[in-house]
């Protein structure tokens, strides 16, 4: 039985050089950094299959992995269970994500332990870490995670296999139109429309076990797995800056409905407080959230 007092990680995952690289680039510059989390016993195939079976249905997502870069809506399901998908991931042509792993006791301290190593650099720039979460991705050989964006600050740690994560500039409306940002923050999907002429503007990050990449808030990206099974861990967090950017998008949606063409929220260090406050006031008065 696992000792409840045992540390989740027994040594630092991010060494001083990696922490310095992160501090210099955060929160807007995507970059690679080294980590020492490979071969963790909680992150092997059988352990993850059991985790997937233990998580509530809303915390697992799995579907076909033999996809194009761009898809219209959610990809199709495979007909397998989450346990079958992960245990047979080498042959199922699938992609699976286990969400909010911190809700399970054995995994509760893992995202916190890793983010704790980076807390000083994070809080010096964007203040308190909010809504810290962990996500595990298990992918078949050559699987594709289609083009999308995410609202969190994100570090993706590669644990097994290889993949290429290709990022595009965050906040550039060529790659994610303002109207799509606005609809996402009001409950729309995170999938984005792909055009082949985007490719020259992307920055590919080749990842092998022991390497990680930082993905800024709402930076469009897609992922292509290598020729072997891949396991990756995302540790994510929100900040008051990221929430203000999202709420400013909500305000812009209201302005757009009035026939205006509002300016997009500024990227860090712009604070977007006026529009964020206006949206929060509107939301409170109308019961939006």
Description of each model-found segment:
Residues 102-136:
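A gly/proline- and charged-residue-enriched helix-loop-helix capping module
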Residues 148-151, 158, 168, 225-228:
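Short glycine/proline-enriched turns and hinge-like loops at secondary-structure junctions
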Residues 131, 144-154, 200-201:
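A short beta-loop-beta micro-motif enriched in histidine and acidic residues
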């Amino acid at each position: 039985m696992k000792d409840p007092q045992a540390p989740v990680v027994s040594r630092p995952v991010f060494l001083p050089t990696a922490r310095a690289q992160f501090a210099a680039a955060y929160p807007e510059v995507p970059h690679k950094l080294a980590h020492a989390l490979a071969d963790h016993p909680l992150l092997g195939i059988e352990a993850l299959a059991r985790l997937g079976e233990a998580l509530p249905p809303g915390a697992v997502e799995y579907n076909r992995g033999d996809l194009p870069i761009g898809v219209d809506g959610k990809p199709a399901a495979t007909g397998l269970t989450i346990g079958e998908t992960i245990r047979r991931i080498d042959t199922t042509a699938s992609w699976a994500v286990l969400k909010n792993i911190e809700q399970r006791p054995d995994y509760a301290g893992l995202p916190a332990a890793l983010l704790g190593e980076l807390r000083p650099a994070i809080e010096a720039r964007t203040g308190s870490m909010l809504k810290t979460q962990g996500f595990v991705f298990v992918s078949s050989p050559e699987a594709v995670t289609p083009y999308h964006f995410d609202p969190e600050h994100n570090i993706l740690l590669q644990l097994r296999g290889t993949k290429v994560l290709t990022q595009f500039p965050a906040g550039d409306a060529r790659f994610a139109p303002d109207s799509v940002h606005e609809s996402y923050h009001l409950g729309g999907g995170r999938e984005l429309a792909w055009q082949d002429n985007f490719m020259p503007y992307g920055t590919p990050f080749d990842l092998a076990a022991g390497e990680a990449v930082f993905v800024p808030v709402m930076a469009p990206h897609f992922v292509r797995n290598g020729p072997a099974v891949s396991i990756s861990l995302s540790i994510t967090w929100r900040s008051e800056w990221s929430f203000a950017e999202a709420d400013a998008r909500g305000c812009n949606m209201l302005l757009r409905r009035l026939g205006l063409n509002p300016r997009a929220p500024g990227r860090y260090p712009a604070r977007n407080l006026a529009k964020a406050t206006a949206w929060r006031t509107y939301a409170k008065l109308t019961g939006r959230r």
